[in-house]
């Protein structure tokens, strides 16, 4: 019985589903990835594609304070250079919903938000995050890549020749993923192994990340 318990404690699972309730799986001790496989509303995906088509830079960060459970995140001025594009208000409304859902699920009072347009892999080698949990969603472009538990020797993280190319999993555009990191209590040594994808030449991606800061 003790051996079985020890084996269970050293196993991590990844869950994917078509409803937002799937994200609650991240709270389970034996889970280090939960993915809501969502289909983006057309007005949001159209906005994201239009934004990318302008070939303008975007790299914005916010530290959001949410002192009360029902506090609405203040995203005033976020991506304001694109406010005249059709679909901007719906896009910001979606960002607010994700921030609120993230805060509600984790009981977070402070959240770090990053919204970026990328034309290259920000973190091209497989790695783990030294945070409790991170939300990642790609609004347009290729999604982040990850590995199932046991696919790669963690001692070889960062070494390109050790990466199992045939076993790489990939998120789709629109998917909302919660990635458990090394600083989640009890998850030390089991942060999800993942990396940024390399966009094709001339392609870009619009990505949102949320970090639980407190």
Name each model-derived stretch:
Residues 30-33, 132-135, 174, 204-205:
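Short, surface-exposed beta-edge/turn micro-motifs
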Residues 76-120, 128:
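Extracellular-facing segments of soluble proteins and assemblies that are Gly/Ser/Thr-biased and enriched
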Residues 44-46, 146-148, 180, 187-188:
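Short helix/loop capping segments that flank catalytic or ligand/cofactor-binding pockets
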Residues 1-79, 89-97:
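N-terminal auxiliary "cap/dimerization" subdomain that precedes the catalytic jelly-roll/cupin core
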Residues 20, 121-124, 192-195:
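Glycine-rich, charged/polar anion/phosphate-binding loops
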Residues 95, 115-117, 139-149, 211-214:
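Active-site environment of non-heme Fe oxygenases that use a 2-His-1-carboxylate facial triad
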Residues 164-214:
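Catalytic core of Fe(II)/2-oxoglutarate
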Residues 120-175:
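Catalytic core of non-heme Fe(II) oxygenases with the double-stranded beta-helix
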